[in-house]
UniProtKB/Swiss-Prot annotation:
Pathway: Lipid metabolism; fatty acid biosynthesis. Homodimer. GO terms for molecular function: 3-oxoacyl-[acyl-carrier-protein] synthase activity; beta-ketoacyl-acyl-carrier-protein synthase III activity. It is found in: Cytoplasm. GO terms for biological process: fatty acid biosynthetic process. The last Arg residue of the ACP-binding site is essential for the weak association between ACP/AcpP and FabH. GO terms for cellular component: cytoplasm. The keyword Translocase does not apply. This is Beta-ketoacyl-[acyl-carrier-protein] synthase III. InterPro entries: ACP_syn_III_C (IPR013747), ACP_syn_III_N (IPR013751), FabH (IPR004655), Thiolase-like (IPR016039). Transmembrane segments: none annotated. The active site is at 119, 252, 282.
C-alpha cells in the first residue's frame, strides 16, 4: 500500500511582549537610531513584532506551539515518533533544540533532530518528515519552526533590526492513506552566503567574529521573487496541477513586497495570499507554520484546500511544499 502524509493539527505561540513600530522606534531613538512607523510599514508592511523574554529560549516557544498542534490533532505527546525542529537560533550549540523539546514534552526514544535552512527551514523540515513517513520510518511527526531572532539583531542597524520577531509554529504530520503532501521542491546556492548571514563562528565555547545578523536587502529581494516563483511552479508540475489550483498561498512572511510580487507572478489573487507579517514581523523558520495556524484558526483555510507553502532564506536556500489540507 502506498503511504502518504497529511497535516492533522496546527499550533503556534508568540511571546507576550508585543512591540509596535512606534514603540520600537522610541527604544531605538534612545540609542541614536532613527526610524518610524511610516518608514517601516512603507518598506516592509510590518506594524508589530513579538520579542521573547531574556530567559525564554527557542525550545520554550517550540514546546508551547507543539502542545497546541497536538491538541488540534487530538494526539498526546507520547503518540509522536519523530520530532524535527527548524531553527537558526537553537538554545545551545548542541544538543539539538529537538532533543530539548522532546525532553520538555516528556517523551523519549523517537528520533529528534534540527534542520537549519534559516527562513526556508520549515519547508525543508516538512519535506524531510514527509519522506520519513512515506518510507515507514515514522507515523506521527511533530514538525516545528521556532526562533528567537531578537538575540542576533544589531539594534544599531535600522535596516535589519526592525524586520524580525520571535515565535514558533508547529504541525502534526501523520501517515495517511490519501495524499496530503502533494509535492515539494528544495534548492540551495551557497555562492550567496554573504547576502544574509550571521558571520560569527563558535570556537572554544565563544563566538568569534560578528555574532549579529547582516543582510543585503536589495540582493535578497532580487533573488527571492524569482526563486520563489520557480520553486512553486516546480512543485505544481510534480503534482500535475496549475497555479489556478492554489486555494491559498502561504509564503515565508519576510516582506509584503516580496510576498505580493510572488503572488502576482503565480496569478494568485490578493485575497488568497495569507499575510501575517504585519503582526509578526519576520520570524524566520517559524513564519510559515505561524501563518498556517493563524489561517486555520481564523477559518480561512479549510479541510480539502490546496495550499502552497514557500520559503526563502540565508544560504541561499529556498523551496516550496504543495499540500492538500
Amino acid at each position: 500500500m502506498t503511504r502518504y502524509s497529511r497535516i492533522t493539527g496546527t499550533g503556534s505561540y508568540l511571546p507576550p511582549r508585543r512591540l509596535t513600530n512606534a514603540e520600537l522606534a522610541a527604544e531605538l531613538a534612545t540609542k541614536g537610531v532613527e526610524t518610524s512607523d511610516e518608514w517601516i510599514v512603507e518598506r516592509t508592511g510590518i506594524r508589530a513584532r513579538h520579542f521573547a523574554a531574556p530567559d525564554v529560549s527557542s525550545s520554550d516557544l517550540a514546546v508551547k506551539a507543539a502542545r497546541h498542534a497536538l491538541e488540534a490533532a487530538g494526539r498526546q505527546a507520547s503518540d509522536i515518533d519523530l520530532i524535527i525542529v527548524a531553527t537558526s537560533t537553537p538554545d545551545m550549540v548542541f544538543p539539538s533544540a529537538a532533543c530539548i523539546v522532546q525532553n520538555k514534552l516528556g517523551i523519549a526514544g523517537c528520533p529528534a533532530f534540527d534542520v537549519q535552512a534559516v527562513c526556508s527551514g520549515f519547508v525543508y523540515a516538512l519535506t524531510v518528515a514527509d519522506a520519513l513517513i512515506k518510507t515507514g520510518s515514522a507515523t506521527k511527526a511533530l514538525v516545528i519552526g521556532a526562533e528567537v531572532f531578537s538575540r542576533i539583531l544589531d539594534f544599531s542597524d535600522r535596516t535589519t533590526c526592525v524586520l524580525f520577531g520571535d515565535g514558533a509554529g508547529a504541525v502534526v504530520l501523520e501517515a495517511s492513506e490519501t495524499p496530503g503532501i502533494l509535492a515539494s521542491d528544495l534548492h540551495a546556492d551557497g555562492k550567496h552566503v554573504g547576502i544574509l548571514c550571521v558571520p560569527g563562528n563558535v570556537s572554544g565555547g565563544q563566538v568569534l567574529g560578528d555574532p549579529l545578523l547582516k543582510m543585503d536587502g536589495q540582493a535578497v529581494f532580487k533573488l527571492a521573487v524569482g526563486v520563489l516563483e520557480s520553486s512553486a511552479r516546480a512543485a505544481l508540475a510534480k503534482a500535475n496541477l496549475r497555479d489556478t489550483d492554489i486555494d491559498w498561498l502561504i509564503p515565508h512572511q519576510a516582506n509584503i513586497r516580496i510576498m505580493q510580487s510572488t503572488a502576482k507572478k503565480l496569478k494568485v489573487p490578493p485575497e488568497k495570499l495569507i499575510v501575517t507579517v504585519d503582526e509578526h514581523g519576520n520570524t524566520s523558520a517559524a513564519s510559515i507554520p505561524l501563518a498556517l495556524d493563524a489561517s486555520v484558526r481564523s477559518g480561512k483555510v479549510k479541510k480539502g484546500d490546496t495550499l502552497m507553502l514557500e520559503g526563502v532564506g540565508g544560504g541561499f536556500t529556498w523551496g516550496a511544499v504543495l499540500l492538500n489540507y
